[in-house]
Every structure is written in C-alpha cells, then in structure tokens.
C-alpha cells in the first residue's frame, strides 16, 4: 500500500489522526510535567501497516525516549498500550490475558483480510463510546482468579531504562558518565527473554514473557474437589473471636442452599455443609485463597468423610500398596522423666556421684580404764557383724579427672558461696 500523502488510495480515509496516545502508567513515566512531540502519519503501524500519528516523549530522567508503535485502532481491539502492548487493565501480556479469560481471538494476518477486518472494527468502535474494548474481548465479561493474582498494576519504571551500550561491552566506550546508554553486563543470549517480537506479543503466540507467567500460574496452589461425590462440606479456618455463624451464612448463602453450619469456637473453625455438591464446588472455587470476612482472611478447604478418616487411622504405618512398614531402627526411645526439684537444685550437669559427708572410718579407740580390751580377731566369738559397704549417700565422691568437670568450679553454686 502506498503511504504517500499525495497519492489518492482507496484506504486514505482510514489513516489515523489522534490528539493523545493510549499509554499505560509505566510507559508514560512518573513525571507529571511531560513534553511530547506529535508527528502526523509519521510511521506505519507494525500490525496493520497503516500510517498513524506518532508520539515521542522521555518518561523521566536518565530514561530512554519512547514512542508509539501501533495505531490506536489496533490498541483498542486488544485493549493494550500503544508502546509496550501490555493489557491496560492487568498489565499482562495478551497471551496470558486470553488464557485467563479462556478465549482465543483469531485475527486475520494476511494483508487483504487484515484491512477488511480493521475497517469493520473501526466502524464498530465509532458506534461505541470508545471506553470499552470491542470484538471478542468486549464479549468476555467474566474475570479470572489467575489474572487477579498475576496482575501487575504497580508501575515498573525500570522498564524505561536505556539500552546497554554495545561499545562498553566491547571495551571501546569513551563517553564515560556522559554516555546515554547503560554500562552493564548484557543478559545471556540463550535466555528466552532476550528474544522478543512485537507481532508475537500482539497476536499472543510464542511470547517468552507470557510463557514465564503461565508457568508461574501453574505452580500456584489449587483446591481440587475430592473424588468422593458425597462430600458437600467445606472447612473454614482462622475464624477468631469476632466471626459468628451469621457472618458465614451471609457470605456462603449466595452459592446455594446451606444445610448446616457448625462453629467450633475452641478450634476457631467452622464446617459448612451444603445441600448439593454443585453448590459446594462453586463455594470452594469462589472462596479459596480470597475469602475475607470482617477484615480477616479465612482458610477454605474441603471437608473429609468419616470413612476416609477411619481408613487413615487403619493405614497408619502402611503404604498405599498394603505393605506393613517396620519401625526405623536406631531411634532413641522415650525421654526419661524430668528430674525432681532436689536434683535440679543440686545442678548435677555431668552425672557425677552426689557429694556427701566423708565416710565414717572404723578407728579403734583405747578402752576406758578398768575394762579389759576385747580379744584379738580369730580367738574369740564375734561380738559384732562386720560392717558392709557404706550406703550411697555415705560413699566418698569418685575421682574427678578434669577440673572443668567439677560443677563447684564452674560457678554452679556461685550464689550460695557469694558474700551477702
């Protein structure tokens, strides 16, 4: 198609002339006082190849100049920014948004079909108020939980930084701090994020950024319904003391008929039983990881049947295939009972024998005057039984091999010996 302003082509009346671009907050920049240049029919759109009005501006200090890449018609068809081609509502690539909304917009890619499709869409846009997307995206009214979790609504201004200086990478940059490009090490060329195509992002195919986000979404926790279709009970945890049965009923009644609500105040949880399985599945899907009642986030899970809980008790120590597992050898047994108060007071940290009074030594004293001494041993009858070993509390303490093992030297009884 000829792009000369003087040529009279059949599509000349469809050239775009706009007064302000359609941009996201990140591309626009953080500076509210921005200077922007406008050039009518400055370039052709990279999607529909029609001339359009190009806007160019600098989003901030030490940032690179940015400009619009696609026309406003292509931007309105996909509800994306004219520069970065990210969704204006969620800040996500088109491929992620379409996957979250569960629809695929098959736009024509050949020249003739693309022009015909664009003209029809422009007519539809002119008949609308211009604030809502048209086409397949305008018909998708339902929102997705995945999009709400992955949404990037906070501006990320580092995306506007200059590109890496190729001369600095080769060691030949002589500008120093005056160089408008970044002096940083480039990313790995084998990294998928290093190869991005604007057309692939617009059509939602082979987008490496979208693939990374979709992989992250696949690893998010999910609440799968149990295989037992008779389970219609949901477990709600983390109630606290402020949430009552009425608060739970006011939230869950919208999903279907509620049979019973049992609140266990001691455990701060509740069990909500629905009349039908479908109502329980809808309630679990709409409430998992996003239920907030009275400013408190609650935990929602599926309840378990009594039969399943009984099987778990029976299968204790048994694998799924029915093999009985032996206990692991070498594990320590039960811990001994705690020491008594007297033993704690003694502070016997090294299992030393308790210290007591010195052992009594049987020393023969001279008999008083006027009394005959006893006969020597072996010549007379035994008057007394020989003494046995002294009791434990009378035994002398065992030898201490190292001074550090003596609790008396380690300050265990410092309070007793310290002067008042």
Curated annotation (Swiss-Prot):
Q: Name one GO molecular function term.
A: pre-mRNA binding
List compositional bias (Basic and acidic residues) regions by residue number: 309-318
Q: Which cysteines are joined by disulfide bonds?
A: none
Q: Where is this cross-link: Glycyl lysine isopeptide (Lys-Gly) (interchain with G-Cter in SUMO2)?
A: 139, 149, 290
Q: Name one GO biological process term.
A: cellular response to xenobiotic stimulus
Q: Which residues carry this modification: N-acetylalanine?
A: 2
Q: Give me the ranges of the annotated region Disordered.
A: 303-343, 372-420
Positions modified as Phosphoserine? 4, 102
**Any idea which UniProt keywords this protein has?**
Acetylation, Cytoplasm, Isopeptide bond, Metal-binding, mRNA processing, mRNA splicing, Nucleus, Phosphoprotein, RNA-binding, Spliceosome, Transport, Ubl conjugation, Zinc, Zinc-finger
Zinc fingers (C3H1-type), as residue ranges, are 159-186
Q: Where are the N6-acetyllysine residues found in this chain?
A: 212
List the SMART domains hit by this protein, alphabetically. Answer: RRM, ZnF_C3H1
Function, in words: Required for pre-mRNA splicing as component of the activated spliceosome. Involved in the first step of pre-mRNA splicing. Binds directly to the internal stem-loop (ISL) domain of the U6 snRNA and to the pre-mRNA intron near the 5' splice site during the activation and catalytic phases of the spliceosome cycle. Involved in both translocations of the nuclear SLU7 to the cytoplasm and the cytosolic calcium-binding protein PDCD6 to the nucleus upon cellular stress responses.
Which family does the similarity line name? Answer: Belongs to the SLT11 family.
State how it assembles.
Component of the pre-catalytic and catalytic spliceosome complexes. Component of the postcatalytic spliceosome P complex. Interacts with PDCD6; the interaction induces translocation of PDCD6 in the cytoplasm. Interacts with PPIL1.
The free-text domain remark for this protein reads: The C-terminal RRM domain and the zinc finger motif are necessary for RNA-binding.
For this entry, the protein name equals Pre-mRNA-splicing factor RBM22
Provenance organism: Homo sapiens
């Amino acid at each position: 198609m000829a792009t000369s302003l003087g040529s009279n082509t059949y599509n000349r009346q469809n050239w775009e002339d706009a007064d302000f671009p359609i941009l996201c907050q990140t591309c626009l920049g953080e500076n509210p006082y921005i200077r922007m240049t406008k050039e009518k029919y400055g370039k052709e759109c990279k999607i529909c190849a029609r001339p359009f009005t190009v806007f160019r501006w600098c989003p901030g200090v030490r940032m690179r100049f940015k400009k619009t890449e696609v026309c406003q018609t292509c931007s309105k068809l996909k509800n994306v920014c004219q520069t970065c081609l990210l969704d204006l509502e969620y800040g996500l690539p088109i491929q992620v948004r379409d996957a979250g909304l569960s629809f695929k917009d098959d736009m024509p890619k050949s020249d003739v079909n693309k022009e015909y499709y664009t003209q029809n869409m422009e007519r539809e846009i002119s008949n609308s108020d211009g604030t809502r997307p048209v086409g397949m995206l305008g018909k998708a009214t339902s929102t997705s939980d995945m999009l709400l979790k992955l949404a990037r609504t906070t501006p990320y201004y580092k995306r506007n930084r200059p590109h890496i200086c190729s001369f600095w990478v080769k060691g030949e940059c002589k500008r120093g701090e005056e160089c408008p490009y970044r002096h940083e090490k480039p990313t790995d060329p084998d990294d998928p994020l290093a190869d991005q195509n604007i057309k692939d992002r617009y059509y939602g195919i082979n987008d490496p950024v979208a693939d990374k986000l979709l992989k992250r979404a696949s690893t998010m926790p999910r609440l799968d319904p149990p295989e037992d279709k008779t389970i219609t009970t949901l477990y709600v945890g983390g109630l606290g003391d402020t949430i009552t049965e009425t608060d739970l009923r006011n939230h869950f009644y919208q999903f279907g008929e509620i049979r019973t609500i049992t609140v266990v105040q001691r455990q701060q949880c509740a069990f909500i039983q629905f009349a039908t399985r479908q109502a329980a599945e809808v309630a679990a899907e709409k409430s998992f990881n996003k239920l907030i009642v009275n400013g408190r986030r609650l935990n929602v899970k599926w309840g378990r049947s009594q039969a399943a809980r009984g099987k778990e008790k029976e299968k204790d120590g048994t694998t799924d295939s029915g093999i009985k597992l032996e206990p692991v050898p070498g594990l320590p047994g039960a811990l001994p009972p705690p020491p008594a108060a007297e033993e704690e007071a003694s502070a016997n940290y090294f299992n030393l024998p308790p210290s007591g009074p010195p052992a009594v030594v049987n020393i023969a004293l001279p008999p008083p005057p006027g009394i005959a001494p006893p006969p020597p041993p072996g010549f007379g009858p035994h008057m007394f039984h020989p003494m046995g070993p002294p009791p434990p509390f009378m035994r002398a303490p065992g030898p201490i091999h190292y001074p550090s093992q003596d609790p008396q030297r380690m300050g265990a009884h410092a309070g007793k010996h310290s002067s008042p």
